[in-house]
């Protein structure tokens, strides 16, 4: 997974895996500012994308004091699973909840904003139906929903 944009120097990058749906490894990563974050941007990527495609958000917001957390959905990026296929929509929202709980534990008093693009906007909107109180707000960019 590569990105056209390079990560700015001095940004703290962390990454890893957790056990996702049906035992598949789910890749996650975050970028942290030097000081305590003002807020967290929880980025949810779109179809056939991966979390590394959002370095423009990282490079803009992290130097301003915001943390950025994201994961690769099942079957996307570095996460395991059949490429771009899920058995049920909860295969997207389940790992999102698992990762959100980890982020909330590491940033207990910081507002968290969901940022979803395209299919990530749809996933984010569906997640918010059950977990609206998890987030201080949401930004849905071109969500894949019918209005």
Predicted regions and their residues:
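Conserved alpha/beta-hydrolase
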Residues: 53, 58-81
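Alpha/beta-hydrolase-fold enzymes
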Residues: 117-147
